[in-house]
From Swiss-Prot:
The gene is TUBB. Its cofactor is Mg(2+). It comes from Euglena gracilis. This is Tubulin beta chain. GTP binds at residues 11, 67, 136, 140-142, 202. Belongs to the tubulin family.
């Protein structure tokens, strides 16, 4: 069975990650008392995320943080028992929102013990498919130490997939002033070392939580939303499905150029907890919701860019034919939003088991050039501070060089212009609506 090793780093990563395990355990039928589900569908691929230990306990992830606080609350939580105690790796100092501490000073002291646990988990796999890391890019541990871990794992397992769920900070919902620094330095690493990055914007979650889920503070809503997406992205891996059944297939279908592996993710239906049982959704409704900018988890409007590729994962009992028709329908009606030099660029898959409490749902992953808006915004904030060298002493004090900041900045700007280049790729034919005739002339 092709396993995925799950790692959660830093406070945000651990909050999202532990919620993810609650959702997954619920679906796979692993209760807190550790009795695995009895239906064959639940058990068939349970090993993708779980490994069996003595007494039939199913023990998943690796948790790491530079301070013990979050770990303690995870351990005390309802699912704290399903984690193996030696998979909690934590320091005592904390990174204090400082990327340099996570990456260069505090992080490296802890990294070897994390890698030992990673090795131990990887060795117990029959056929390791890859790693998934949940972290945020705005803090110190998830961003600094998270990217350090990613590069170390890259060295040791160069041919395994590396997927990250990265929470990208936003100007509206900001925890720390130095977020632009931390984010830019992290993106610099993720461009080089990750295979697939699911970008989750803080601000977008805020916007979703407010109107649709009727939550005023995005705390509970956050993790639930993100874990809905994580569970949707990985449901093909956990339950028998028809298409995109592993991380590598996902990557092959979604990444036309190696550096452009930052994805927008969305989820449908988004309803508040109370109102979800009153209406059944149809496949067309799901499709429409799924492509709606309001359902995107990153603060980029897909309408401002074009889709290079996209992948839609439907869950529940529905006809595959209907799904395919809907997908074609979307492409035909909105052809200007899809680049015409990649024909059939939406992949769809259907998995028979819907998430808990819903008849059917859809998870959407899109490689859209509009994601550059998010990087642009961070980059502008970065430049504003870096020009005055504000807060820089915290980083240089940990042994960093200004050169590294300049490199990270230009790497991120390159990324933005690459997205822009492919967005404009066939700008001549855009003028009229008779694109088809134009294409024939060229």
């Amino acid at each position: 069975m092709r396993e995925i090793v799950h790692i959660q780093a830093g406070q945000c990563g651990n909050q999202i990650g532990s919620k993810f395990w609650e959702v997954i355990s619920d679906e796979q039928g692993v209760d807190p008392p550790d009795i695995p589900g009895d239906s064959d569908l639940q058990l068939e691929r349970i090993n993708v995320y779980y490994n069996e230990a003595t007494g039939g306990r199913y023990v998943p992830a690796i948790l790491m943080d530079l301070e013990p606080g979050t770990m303690d609350s995870v351990r005390a939580g309802p699912y704290g028992q399903i984690f193996r105690p030696d998979n909690f790796v934590f320091g005592q100092t904390g990174a204090g929102n400082n990327w340099a501490k996570g990456h260069y000073t505090e992080g490296p002291e802890l990294i070897d013990s994390v890698l030992d646990v990673v090795r131990k988990e990887a060795e117990s796999c029959d056929c390791l498919q890859g790693f998934q890391i949940a972290h945020s890019l705005g803090g110190g541990t998830g961003s600094g130490m998270g990217t350090l871990l990613i590069s170390k794992i890259r060295e040791e397992y160069p041919d395994r997939m590396m997927m990250t769920f990265s929470v990208i900070p936003s100007p509206k919902v900001s925890d720390t002033v130095v977020e632009p620094y931390n984010t830019t330095l992290s993106v610099h690493q993720l461009v080089e070392n990750a295979d697939e990055v699911m970008c989750i914007g803080n601000e977008a979650l805020y916007d979703i939580c407010l109107p649709t889920l009727k939550l005023t503070t995005p705390t509970f809503g956050h993790e639930t939303l993100v874990s809905a997406v994580m569970s949707g992205v990985t449901c093909c891996l956990r339950f028998p499905g028809q298409l995109n059944s592993d991380l590598r297939k996902l990557a092959v279908n979604l990444i036309p150029f190696p550096r452009l592996h930052f994805f927008l993710v969305g989820f449908a239906p988004l309803t508040s907890r109370g109102s979800q049982q009153y209406r059944a959704l149809t496949v067309p409704e799901l499709t429409q919701q799924m492509f709606d900018a309001k359902n995107m988890m990153a603060a980029s409007d897909p309408a401002h860019g074009r889709y290079l590729t996209a992948s839609a994962m439907f869950r529940g009992r529905m006809s595959t034919k209907e799904v395919d028709e809907q997908m074609l329908n979307v492409q035909n009606k909105n052809s200007s939003y899809f680049v015409e030099w990649i024909p059939n660029n939406i992949k769809s898959s259907v998995c028979d088991i819907p998430p808990k409490g819903l008849k059917m749902s859809a998870t959407f992953i899109g490689n859209n050039t509009a994601i550059q808006e998010m990087f642009k915004r961070v980059s502008e904030q970065f430049t504003a501070m870096f020009r005055r060298k504000a807060f820089l002493h915290w980083y240089t004090g940990e042994g960093m060089d200004e050169m590294e900041f300049t490199e990270a900045e230009s790497n991120m700007n390159d990324l933005v212009s690459e997205y822009q280049q492919y967005q404009d790729a066939t700008v001549e034919e855009e003028g009229e609506f008779d694109e088809e005739e134009d294409v024939e002339q060229y």
